[in-house]
Every structure is written in C-alpha cells, then in structure tokens.
C-alpha cells in the first residue's frame, strides 16, 4: 500500500511538472481504482471472519482505506479543491496537516499521532446517506 502511494505521488508530480493535467488525473484514477479493489478485498475477507479476528481485520481495512483516501485527496486537492476540502472537513482534521505533503506517506496511525491524538481514538463526522463530496458541474444537469 505504501509503495502504491509513493508510485502514484511520484507519477502525479511528474505529470503536473509537465503540465499534463489529464495524465495526473489518470494517475489518480488508477490509484483510486486499485485502492477500491484493496478495500473491497480486505473488507470481504474481514466479513468472512468471526469475533475479534473479524473486528481486527475490518479495523485494519478501514485504517488502510483512510490512508489511501487521504493520499488521493492530497493529490487531487489542486484540481478539485472544494470536494477535497469537504473530505477533510468530514475527517475532522486540520486542513494544514491534512493537505501537507510532509504527511503524505504517513500511515494513518502516524498521521493521527502527529495531530497529538492516540491511534484509534480520532472520530470523524458522520456522513448523511448517499453523500457526494464532488458536486456536478452545471453542464452535467
């Protein structure tokens, strides 16, 4: 997971350096699709377990998914700032820390510790049902 984040960030930065926004977005798309597959596989595997083992596996799947979502959000922030800032708001994290490239490769536990909190104790804001962080452009209606 960390290697995938590092590769995505490097490819994204190379594309942005060359002003290849379409390529940068493709990097984000590929990274998010792979992250979604990792989440799907990990959550399905956790659901097949029972008791404490199931809880531990699902917790790890969520922790990993948060890390990958945070990395993707940092990458996309300059392109779709409003939606990315809304993600940050619902994670209930200081935007300066959340969007800092200094934290991009930190695990969820490392990131939470850098905020002065204990891993596993940070609370996020509840999402309303069927919530979308990225609103449609007026031309899409």
Model-derived segments and spans:
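Long, amphipathic alpha-helical stalk/connector segments used for oligomerization, subunit docking
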Residues: 1-24
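Basic, alpha-helical terminal appendages of large translation-related enzymes
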Residues: 29-141
């Amino acid at each position: 997971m960390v290697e995938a984040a590092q590769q995505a960030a490097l490819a994204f930065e190379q594309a942005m350096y060359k002003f290849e926004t379409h390529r940068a977005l493709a990097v984000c798309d590929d990274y998010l699709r792979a992250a979604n597959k990792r989440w799907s596989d990990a959550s399905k595997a956790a659901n097949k377990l029972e008791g404490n083992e199931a809880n531990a596996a699902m917790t790890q799947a969520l922790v990993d998914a948060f890390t990958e979502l945070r990395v993707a959000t940092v990458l996309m922030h300059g392109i779709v700032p409003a939606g990315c800032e809304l993600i940050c708001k619902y994670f209930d994290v200081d935007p300066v820390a959340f969007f800092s490239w200094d934290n991009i490769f930190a695990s969820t536990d490392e990131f939470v510790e850098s905020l002065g909190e204990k891993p596993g104790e940070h609370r996020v804001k509840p999402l309303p049902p069927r919530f979308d962080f990225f609103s449609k452009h007026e031309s899409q209606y």
